[in-house]
């Protein structure tokens, strides 16, 4: 009797593992490359006078007032500096219709610039990121920087945001 029960369990799991899964895998497109320049000057190059010496990101929707958001700085083929953001800020659902959902992340950017040997200036900017999620695709859809639309997704194109100060 024990053998029959064991055999039934093995057959059940064998049949369960052979089932056909018709669900497709959701594609994710959320990597952002953010460039900041002023009058043609790469503001993220710390070696250029007048550029930002430090940049910090803080998640407005984070659990605490101080919720840092991680990002990487990198250089492109033209040796321009940019900030690469993968994920990390909390996403809040703002709209849902059928199988499509819209999420929003709100991030403060603190941009420190050296004025002279003893004085730094810290600017505070706001970036709002909208994501669209469907069963097949999760992607960045729009980005506002200081309440100005700076990016709208074009299918097949990289998520590059260019900020001019």
Regions found by a protein language model. Give the residues of each.
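Short amphipathic, basic-aromatic surface patches that mediate peripheral association
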Residues: 35-50
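Tryptophan-paired
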Residues: 52-116
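C-terminal motif of bacterial Sec signal peptides marking the signal peptidase cleavage site
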Residues: 14-17
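Glycine-rich, aromatic-bearing surface loops/beta-hairpins
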Residues: 117-165
């Amino acid at each position: 009797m024990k053998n029959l029960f064991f055999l039934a369990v093995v057959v059940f799991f064998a049949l369960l593992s052979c089932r056909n899964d018709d669900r497709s895998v959701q594609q994710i497109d959320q990597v952002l490359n953010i460039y900041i320049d002023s009058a043609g000057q790469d503001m993220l190059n710390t070696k250029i006078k007048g550029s930002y010496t430090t940049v910090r990101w803080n998640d407005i929707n984070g659990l605490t007032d101080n919720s840092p958001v991680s990002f990487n700085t990198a250089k492109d083929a033209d040796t321009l500096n940019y900030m690469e953001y993968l994920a990390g800020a909390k996403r809040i659902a703002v709209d849902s219709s059928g199988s499509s959902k819209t999420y929003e992340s709100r991030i403060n950017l603190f941009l420190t610039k050296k004025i002279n040997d003893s004085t730094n200036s810290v600017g505070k900017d706001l970036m709002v990121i909208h994501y669209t999620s469907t069963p097949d695709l999760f992607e960045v859809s729009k980005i506002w920087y200081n309440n100005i639309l700076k990016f709208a997704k074009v299918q097949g194109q990289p998520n590059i945001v260019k900020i001019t100060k």
